[in-house]
């Protein structure tokens, strides 16, 4: 009896551990998991024009160390970036399906935040779980503090700190 309970517990624990959990920092307002995953391949491109081109280029550069290649930014692609006046300035929706990743933001800044969320979802093998994320900040001002009074920070360290703040959607 004791062995069967232990075996059942071990099986449940193994099953729970094998499922990929959706962990995003900070936690979005709404996450809906779906079936399947999007795979970033050598043919994957980011579709971005105008003001959205710069956030797309930053994302492509940031994701290169994770997947081993940079994603090109073009007029057409599987990762679609758009803005909508119907959304609040920093509000976004990120929809990942097995075929496409669609990002709709209230502004280029919101699209940048959505790309930071996507950055956290990308696995080292280039897969992204199918999910719909809807988010907007709870607070207008979000930030971090760098105490430079007790320790000298080099320019590169300060830039790295700013990159970490941006990755966590702090303004």
State the predicted function of each range.
Residues 1-4:
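Positively charged n-region of N-terminal signal peptides that target proteins for export
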Residues 6-7, 68:
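Short amphipathic alpha-helical "recognition" segments used for binding
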Residues 7-10, 43:
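Intrinsically disordered/low-complexity terminal segments and short unstructured peptides
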Residues 9-18:
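Hydrophobic h-region of N-terminal signal peptides that target proteins for export
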Residues 20-142, 147:
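Contiguous, structured surface segment used for ligand recognition
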Residues 139-140, 144-171:
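Substrate-binding cleft of carbohydrate-active enzyme catalytic domains
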């Amino acid at each position: 009896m004791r062995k069967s309970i232990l075996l059942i517990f071990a099986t449940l624990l193994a099953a729970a551990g094998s499922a990929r959990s959706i962990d995003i920092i900070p936690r979005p307002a709404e996450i809906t998991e779906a079936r399947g995953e999007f795979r970033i391949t050598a043919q994957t491109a980011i579709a971005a024009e105008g003001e959205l081109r710069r956030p797309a280029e930053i994302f492509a550069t940031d994701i290169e160390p994770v997947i081993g290649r940079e994603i090109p930014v073009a007029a057409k692609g599987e990762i679609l970036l758009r803005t909508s006046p119907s959304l609040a300035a920093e509000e976004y929706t990120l929809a990942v399906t097995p075929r496409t990743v669609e990002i709709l933001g209230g502004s280029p800044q919101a699209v940048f935040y959505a790309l930071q969320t996507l950055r956290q979802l990308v696995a080292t093998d280039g897969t992204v779980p199918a999910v719909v994320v809807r988010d907007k900040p709870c607070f207008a001002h979000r930030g971090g503090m760098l105490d430079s009074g007790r320790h000298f920070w080099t320019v590169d360290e300060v830039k790295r700190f700013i990159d970490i703040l941006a990755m966590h959607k702090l303004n």
